[in-house]
């Protein structure tokens, strides 16, 4: 059996094919897994656990099915769904994890997992914005507002961000290699898995003749799904892409 890792599904009502493909993934591939880790941005936007539409309930039912099959599902918040809280997580039978987590494989190896936005340290303006948005007091005030007001604020912010992105350097989305190495050394790990950049790949980082690391970047779900697998018996790592309409 394998441990599965996904990120950046970006579920929303305007993309029913992705919703359908994700549900197929849950009811088929994920059912056979040892565990499923969702590393953020499962949803395109999350304005609070009280916003429960048909899509949210359908996804919750799909995630509940994993729990019924005794397949644990873990969730790390991303930059699109950082307001997803314990109420919805409990509804889905998901286990919320902190922004970064260290997994210990049966072999004893450590694996660092996170969404990935905190690795883009060259994007100073985003990191300042992230720190601001993750202020607990600010989040409490925002979540106390009527849902209609939260939606209005979100739409205004999104309009600004779309205009701002036109002037952003693409390199700001790149991961700082030294940040990755420092995190791996700190956590006594040689494997790091993340999403966020939408640039799927397995990067081998050779430090010296005897020291090397792996960085696995998960892809965005669009026409294809993206999942990383770790075989619990031999620690083999694969990054798989599959058409969402042919599962």
Curated annotation (Swiss-Prot):
Protein name per Swiss-Prot or TrEMBL: UDP-2,3-diacylglucosamine hydrolase
Cofactor(s) the protein requires to work: Mn(2+)
A molecular function annotated in GO for this UniProt entry is: UDP-2,3-diacylglucosamine hydrolase activity
Q: In which pathway does it act?
A: Glycolipid biosynthesis; lipid IV(A) biosynthesis; lipid IV(A) from (3R)-3-hydroxytetradecanoyl-[acyl-carrier-protein] and UDP-N-acetyl-alpha-D-glucosamine: step 4/6
Q: Which GO terms describe its cellular component?
A: cytoplasm; extrinsic component of plasma membrane
Q: Which gene encodes it?
A: lpxH
* Family, similarity comment: Belongs to the LpxH family.
Which reaction(s) does its UniProt entry say it catalyses? Answer: UDP-2-N,3-O-bis[(3R)-3-hydroxytetradecanoyl]-alpha-D-glucosamine + H2O = 2-N,3-O-bis[(3R)-3-hydroxytetradecanoyl]-alpha-D-glucosaminyl 1-phosphate + UMP + 2 H(+)
Relate the protein's function as given in its record. Answer: Hydrolyzes the pyrophosphate bond of UDP-2,3-diacylglucosamine to yield 2,3-diacylglucosamine 1-phosphate (lipid X) and UMP by catalyzing the attack of water at the alpha-P atom. Involved in the biosynthesis of lipid A, a phosphorylated glycolipid that anchors the lipopolysaccharide to the outer membrane of the cell.
Q: Which keywords does this Swiss-Prot/TrEMBL entry list?
A: Cell inner membrane, Cell membrane, Hydrolase, Lipid A biosynthesis, Lipid biosynthesis, Lipid metabolism, Manganese, Membrane, Metal-binding
Its EC number is 3.6.1.54
Tell me the membrane topology, using the record's own terms: Peripheral membrane protein
Q: How is the cofactor bound?
A: Binds 2 Mn(2+) ions per subunit in a binuclear metal center.
Q: Where does substrate bind?
A: 79-80, 123, 165, 168, 196
Q: What is its main location?
A: membrane
InterPro entries, per database record: Calcineurin-like_PHP_ApaH (IPR004843), LpxH-like (IPR043461), Metallo-depent_PP-like (IPR029052), UDP-diacylglucosamine_Hdrlase (IPR010138)
Q: Which residues bind Mn(2+) 2?
A: 41, 79, 115, 196
Q: Which residues are recorded as binding Mn(2+) 1? A: 8, 10, 41, 198
Q: From the Swiss-Prot or TrEMBL record, state where the protein is found.
A: Cell inner membrane
